[in-house]
Amino acid sequence: MTIQTMQVGPIMTNCYLLCDEDAKVCALIDPGDEAERLEQWVARSGCALRYILLTHGHFDHTSAVRPLLEKHPDVPVYIHQKDCVDGQSGELLFTRVGPENQRYYKEGDVLPLGGLTLRVMETPGHSEGSVCLLLDKEHVMFSGDTLFRCSCGRCDFPGGSYPKMLSSLGRLAALEGDWRVLPGHDRETTLEGERRMNPYVRQGSAR
């Protein structure tokens, strides 16, 4: 397994390329901008693009989806159904994505990627349909805009909720053991570090 990070767009969104190099398959997580760079990135990996996975529907995590599909017309795009409307622009994400590509995931769904398995955890707060994507065996999570290093995502966009954010952070903190946390912005962190240092996680854990 390899995980690479590329920061894209004016808000420096972290897009992740998750590869199972043995099976030669990969997934793009939160392709927010700069589709041509991302396409070249996938090509250099030598892996076939199996999924495009979205932690939520905001423009800075989804804007490269449509141009990527022009090169990969058979690749499914996954998002939680509650986030198929962009909470910032009000734009329907899937007016840009044809019905042949759109897929919805929910709490507990699992997505196989070669020998890897991604599990979906619903984590509303930043948006109504925010999710985290968990590699349980490897203890790696893609936290989107739910959990950041010593912080959490904004809750003042349409569909956001601070009480729901705290509940989601409490659920993440309750995961067993330590985890590598790969957020939608800024540097990666660890769940154990956030349990100790993140005031929002500590508040969520106390609920």
Task: Kindly give the residue locations of the regions a language model identified.
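Short Gly/Pro-enriched turn/cap motifs at secondary-structure boundaries
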Residues: M6-V8, Q102-R103, E122-P124
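Metallo-beta-lactamase
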Residues: K24, D86-L93, T117-R207
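Conserved S/T- and glycine-rich ATP-binding loop of Class I adenylate-forming
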Residues: L18, T55, T123
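Conserved beta-strand hairpin/beta-sheet module of binuclear metal-dependent hydrolase folds
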Residues: M1-S45, C132-G144
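Short catalytic-loop micro-motif centered on adjacent basic/acidic residues
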Residues: C26-I29, Y51-L53, V120-E122
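Hydrophobic residues in well-ordered beta-strands that form the structural core
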Residues: I29, V77-Q81, F142-S143, P183
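Active-site HxH/HxHxD metal-binding segment of metal-dependent hydrolases
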Residues: D33-L116, R196-Q203
